């Protein structure tokens, strides 16, 4: 058991609360210690405290909880000297809140300098992950398991353990012949049908959705943005230009270039609008939409590049360093105006379907401010439209720690007055893949002597990262999405330690290449959840003990009922129909008993015409 010394030196809130005392929580404790704060105004609060936690065993967490709601909490980073811990999103009713520390390990925790601050809104925190590969992994026979080795649905399991946002990446037409000439993405996955299905799984599990348009048939990043094959065909059919022909690209006139850019912008709008409309029709409107993936180099090369570059004619990838084939390469002139055309077309399409969806522009190399200021200064100068700045942050590639990432978020959010989301992060829990070879993330020098590539090292890195991002000034960091939590090793029974899952398929022999992230996922080589899942579980925002989420399409309303209590709850979904004169013409009442700490989905058919949906959650009636 952990020994907890909790010194409540002062509890300061924006309203004046007469509360200041020192409490010595010493001796063995079971499950932690807490204190109740009273005489509070109802509303939302953030909690901070300085915490010393020298033990790496298990997880310990600072929390705040009020009657009728689950706890908001943050896992304590390992720190012998003390670190400021931030808990966001505590919801208070009945004028009181219990604050405390929970633990499942051994050691000593000291807590001091506690502040409970009233806020004007619930400052929640997104702690999500990329779920795009789940259907692909399951098709290969991969299984996801809980901590005890029981098979689970990864969406439901991760949602129940604190993951609240699913990233889903859409590639246009994956399959043989649509990659870079050497590799391709497997057909039938990451395409429209698959991503719509993944979105439904995410919503049914109670997750929000961050939807990424790759605008490519293949992996896209800062050096590779290949125009989708169907768009290439459309441009050739409608304009007569072959935008995959290197000789044409190197000889086209400025008028031809502008004509193609305008057509691409039109295609971007129509494609984005169509996919967004299909998401809306099935009740899975994304909360956040990313236009492209890591587009620091631009989009739809060579028509939207951010700097002068060359692209090889075989793989359509930017060339860096000693270019031995410079005379044959495709020239990619800097063209910010073209990029902004594409961004604004995508933005307008998203907003035409869902005004509430926030549009993200996502770059790599998060924590390196100069790369972002160069990019967003140009976007703003040219009138690009976006709502949120997205950044990938990998310690192995940026060689910056989580504190530096926090300071980067502070600087960039203040300069551009935009919220920030960390779109990707990852860390090794094993030095190599299962076959003994290195994965794509090499251990970062910045954490070399702090967090080794072990399960414990991974857990401690995640705890530090979550806490640092929660402490970004004015809560302007929305949260963080992990890449990739679910692209797990799937054992090849004919080739020991090799994986059936891989990052891409070879054009030459149609064999899957290696899985470069299998030693960074949130499940181990056998598919079993790793300890870092507990960091998600104990780093959450408050929600109602019986939490209700509804989605609807044209024919029915689907209600997800999440019972976060230790007893069975009876919940009723009531649908009232109205005629054209607003007179009630029908009532449906569907009740469901939901067992303790589980979730159920209730589906009710919608009547023709107007309707209203109400939910009785066991204690109050809620209009949805």
Segments predicted by a language model, with ranges:
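Short beta-strand-plus-loop segments that form exposed binding edges in beta-rich domains
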Residues: 100-107
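Boundary/entry segment of secreted carbohydrate-active catalytic domains
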Residues: 121-157
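Extra-cytoplasmic beta-strand recognition segments
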Residues: 25-27, 33-56, 83-90, 113-115, ...
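Glycoside hydrolase catalytic-domain groove-lining segments
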Residues: 154-155, 354-359, 366-447, 457, ...
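Substrate-binding cleft and catalytic face of glycoside hydrolase catalytic domains
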Residues: 157-321, 328-335, 339-358, 364
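Extracellular ligand-binding interfaces
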Residues: 52-80, 575
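Extracellular carbohydrate recognition and processing domains
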Residues: 29-32, 67-94, 109, 594-601
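Aromatic-rich peripheral "rim/lid" segments of glycoside hydrolase catalytic domains that contact
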Residues: 308-309, 318-319, 407, 411, ...
């Amino acid at each position: 058991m952990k020994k907890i010394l909790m010194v409540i030196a002062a509890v300061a809130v924006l309203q004046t609360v007469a509360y200041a005392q020192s409490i010595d929580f010493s001796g063995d404790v079971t499950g932690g210690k807490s204190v109740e704060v009273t005489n509070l105004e109802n509303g939302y609060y953030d909690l901070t405290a300085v915490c010393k936690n020298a033990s790496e065993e298990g997880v310990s967490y600072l929390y705040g909880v009020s009657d009728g709601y689950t706890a908001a909490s943050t896992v304590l980073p390992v720190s012998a000297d003390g670190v400021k811990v931030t808990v966001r999103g505590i919801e208070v009713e009945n004028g009181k809140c219990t604050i405390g520390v929970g633990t499942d390990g051994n050691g000593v925790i000291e807590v001091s300098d506690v502040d409970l601050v009233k806020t004007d809104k619930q400052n929640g925190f997104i702690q999500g992950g990329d779920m795009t590969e789940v259907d692909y992994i399951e098709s290969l026979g991969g299984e996801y398991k809980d901590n005890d080795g029981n098979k689970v649905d990864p969406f439901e399991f991760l949602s129940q353990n604190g993951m609240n946002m699913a990233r889903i990446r859409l590639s246009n037409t994956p399959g043989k012949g649509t990659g870079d000439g050497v590799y391709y993405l497997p057909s039938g996955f990451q395409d429209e049908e698959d991503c719509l299905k993944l979105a439904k799984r995410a919503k049914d599990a109670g997750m929000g959705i961050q939807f990424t348009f790759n605008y490519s048939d293949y992996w896209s990043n800062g050096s590779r943005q290949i125009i989708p094959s169907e768009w290439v065909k459309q441009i050739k059919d409608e304009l007569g230009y072959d935008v995959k022909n290197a000789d044409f690209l190197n000889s086209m006139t400025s008028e031809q270039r502008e004509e193609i850019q305008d057509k691409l912008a039109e295609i971007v709008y129509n494609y984005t609008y169509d996919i967004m409309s299909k998401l809306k029709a099935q009740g899975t409107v994304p909360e956040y939409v990313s236009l492209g993936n890591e587009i620091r180099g631009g989009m739809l090369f060579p028509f939207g590049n951010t700097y002068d570059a060359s692209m090889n004619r075989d793989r359509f990838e930017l060339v860096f360093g000693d270019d031995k084939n410079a005379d044959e390469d495709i020239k990619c002139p800097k063209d910010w105006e073209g990029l902004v055309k594409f961004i604004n077309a995508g933005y307008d399409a998203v907003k035409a379907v869902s005004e509430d969806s926030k549009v993200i522009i996502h770059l790599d190399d998060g924590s390196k401010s100069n790369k972002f200021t160069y990019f967003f200064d140009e976007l703003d100068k040219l009138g690009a439209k976006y709502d949120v700045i997205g950044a990938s942050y990998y310690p192995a590639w940026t060689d910056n720690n989580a504190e530096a990432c926090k300071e980067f978020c502070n600087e960039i959010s203040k300069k551009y007055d935009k919220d920030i989301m960390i779109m990707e992060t990852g860390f090794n829990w094993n030095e190599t893949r299962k076959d003994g070879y290195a994965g794509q993330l090499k251990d970062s020098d910045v954490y070399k002597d702090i967090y080794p590539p072990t399960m414990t090292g991974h857990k401690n890195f995640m705890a530090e990262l979550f806490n640092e991002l929660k402490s970004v000034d004015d809560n302007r960091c929305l949260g963080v999405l992990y890449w990739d939590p679910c692209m797990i090793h799937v054992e090849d029974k004919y080739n020991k330690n090799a994986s059936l899952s891989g990052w891409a398929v070879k054009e030459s022999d149609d064999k899957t290449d290696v899985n470069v992230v299998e030693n960074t996922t949130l499940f181990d080589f056998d598919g079993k959840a790793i300890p870092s899942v507990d960091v998600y579980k104990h780093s959450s925002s408050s929600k109602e003990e019986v939490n209700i989420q509804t989605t609807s399409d044209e024919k029915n309303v689907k209600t997800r009922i999440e019972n976060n209590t230790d007893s069975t709850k009876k919940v009723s979904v009531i649908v009232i129909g109205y005629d054209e004169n607003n007179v009630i013409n029908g009532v449906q009442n569907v009740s469901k008993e939901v067992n303790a700490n589980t979730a159920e989905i209730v589906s009710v058919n919608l009547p023709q015409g107007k309707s209203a949906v109400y939910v009785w959650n066991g204690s109050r009636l809620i209009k949805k």
